[in-house]
């Protein structure tokens, strides 16, 4: 399934033009090692399921092995995530769906070295989020 892909297909890299009912993709990243629709799907999940952009801008506290933060609920993102998850389950094999979920986890793991240099608390948060996502797969 290798195809040309956006390379960084998160919700923050999309613009919706309501009067034209059109979506415009911005900030393509062509230097990815994986050029796959599965990787693009995982980046959409990074935004809609894992709420990367929201969590990345939150203040959080870390207390022993607990990560505490108030995550606001945005109905539009929740609805988008529900539609995306249904689409993936209906159109992908179980194995491909699992690959997408593992790639979603990898989106957070790959950021750990960068977050360690910039914001060590965010590194811990993303590690915790990756662990939570992995635990959900195991269930």
Whereabouts are the PLM-identified features?
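Sequence-level detector for tyrosine residue identity
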Residues: 1-4, 16, 29, 41, ...
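Regulatory N- and C-terminal appendages and interdomain linkers associated
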Residues: 21-23, 95-139
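Active-site activation/catalytic loop segments of kinase-like enzymes and analogous catalytic loops
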Residues: 29-88, 105-120
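Short amphipathic alpha-helical segments and their helix-coil junctions
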Residues: 21-31, 81-95, 133-137
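Active-site acidic catalytic loop and adjacent metal/ATP-binding pocket
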Residues: 1-37
């Amino acid at each position: 399934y290798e195809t040309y892909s956006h390379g960084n297909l998160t919700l923050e890299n999309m613009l919706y033009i309501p009067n034209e009912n059109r979506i415009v993709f911005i900030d393509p990243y062509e230097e990815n090692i994986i050029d796959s629709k599965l990787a693009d799907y995982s980046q959409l999940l990074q935004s809609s399921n894992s709420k990367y952009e929201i969590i990345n801008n939150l203040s959080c506290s870390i207390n022993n092995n607990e990560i505490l933060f108030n995550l606001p609920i945005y109905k539009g993102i929740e609805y988008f995530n529900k539609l995306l998850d249904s689409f993936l389950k209906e159109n992908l094999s179980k194995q491909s769906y699992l690959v997408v979920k593992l790639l979603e986890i990898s989106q957070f793991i790959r950021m750990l070295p960068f977050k360690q240099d910039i914001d060590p608390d965010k590194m811990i948060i993303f590690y915790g989020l990756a662990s939570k996502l992995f635990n959900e797969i195991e269930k």
